[in-house]
Amino acid sequence: MPGFSSPAIILRRTAYAEYDTILDLLTLERGRITAMAKNARKSKKRFAGILEPFCCLDAVFTDPSARSGMTILKEAAMTAPFGAIRLNMEKVAYASYWSEMVNRWVKEDDTQSALFHLLHYVLFMLDSGKASHADLSILFQVRFMTLAGLFPGMAACRVCKTEIDRLSGSPTLYLDIARGGIVCHRCGGEGAGSQYRKPLSRGLVKQFLWVRETDLPQAERMRFTAAAREQGLAALEAFVTYHLAMEIKSLKVLQRIRHW
């Protein structure tokens, strides 16, 4: 039966029937796919210990058959277990949030090689413990929104069109979630308490733009103050869920257990 091979990251797994497992994966070659691992929960040799969430595999698949319409995971070898993530509840929550974002946004068989490399990179860094969980989430969300064509307009106020470098007075800006970009303190002050308008310092906006435009290893070195981190995550998470137009269940878990 025709098939294909590809590096793949496990986004989600679901038990199916008595012994099978359904996997949602982001693959380098085909984008997001759903595949069945037959007898995965019965065999102790074939897929032993490698079908865990966030694992990266070299995988071989059969193309969907006319009868079942299901892609089959034929064989797989672990390339990166990212096991340290699953030993820490907060790491699991962040990785689950990123994975759910990808799983909900990427269409099946829509190749997203840049997104694959982005997700692999942040999972690698999260597993290594070399970077702040929250800073990695800012990096991921900024780059994800850029790839998805959803990144908010941050060069100028969406209302008065004044460029941020030309604004005088208060350094506080607001991310107007419904307008899809920032508004200045003069145009955004009235709705400052709204769930659809989140405060952002001018310095944080510039950090977002730098993270968006530089290469990944350099962007990962960006460090945020505690206040900027909390402000940035509140704004980005609200923006992502609004513009993806869907509930991201893992985000609620993350927000309950997150340690600042």
Swiss-Prot record:
Source organism superkingdom: Bacteria
InterPro entries linked: ARFGAP/RecO (IPR037278), DNA_rep/recomb_RecO_N (IPR022572), NA-bd_OB-fold (IPR012340), RecO (IPR003717), RecO_C (IPR042242)
Name of one Pfam family that matches: RecO_C
This protein's record includes keyword DNA repair: yes
Gene Ontology process terms (BP): DNA recombination; double-strand break repair
Record keyword Aminoacyl-tRNA synthetase present: no
Keywords: DNA damage, DNA recombination, DNA repair
HAMAP family, per database record: RecO
Homology family: Belongs to the RecO family.
Function comment: Involved in DNA repair and RecF pathway recombination.
NCBIfam families, sorted: reco
Protein name: DNA repair protein RecO
The species this protein was found in: Desulfosudis oleivorans (strain DSM 6200 / JCM 39069 / Hxd3) (Desulfococcus oleovorans)
